[in-house]
């Protein structure tokens, strides 16, 4: 059984993430979506909220072939997590050259930690390349329309959170 791990903060999960997930399921028999924390990011949602959001989106996803999809949280080195899950590959999405430079460096470091787990890069679909969770949050905080970047359910989650924390520039 080929297992892949797709790690991310998913704060929030975007249509770009969903595109990578759909396509990754055709490369593996089992895809483990790892929701994690990133010390360099300021999340809008807790790990538990993001986990629930991703699980909900995965329950609604179609066209994933026959791959089993599992959503879990983790708070460890990615390679340790991948080993625990029995993964043979790490799936990473790329939007632009800047993503590649960072991801290339991370893949090299990860290979030093475990050279039996490959990193596979999937290019985001052309129409999805500009989408980034950080930008989705920023647009929402200024009252902009995020409906082109996330599902309706995620948009509702983000709007509710913005209502709690307050809009910028209002």
Predicted features along the sequence, with ranges:
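Nucleotidyltransferase catalytic core that binds NTPs
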Residues: 1-170
């Amino acid at each position: 059984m080929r297992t892949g791990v797709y790690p991310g903060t998913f704060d929030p999960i975007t249509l770009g993430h969903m595109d990578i997930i759909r396509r990754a399921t055709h490369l593996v028999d089992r895809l483990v979506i790892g929701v994690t924390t990133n010390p360099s990011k300021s999340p809008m949602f807790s790990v538990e909220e993001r986990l629930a959001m991703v699980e909900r989106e995965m329950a609604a996803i179609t066209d994933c072939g026959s791959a089993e999809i599992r959503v879990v949280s983790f708070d460890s080195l990615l390679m340790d997590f991948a080993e625990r899950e029995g993964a043979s590959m790490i799936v990473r999405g790329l939007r632009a050259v800047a993503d590649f430079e960072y991801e290339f460096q991370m893949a090299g470091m990860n290979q030093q930690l475990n050279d039996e787990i490959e990193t596979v890069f999937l290019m985001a679909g052309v129409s999805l390349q500009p989408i980034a969770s950080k930008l989705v949050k920023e647009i929402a905080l200024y009252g902009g329309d995020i409906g082109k970047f996330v599902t309706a359910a995620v948009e509702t989650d983000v709007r509710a959170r913005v209502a709690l924390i307050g809009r910028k520039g209002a």
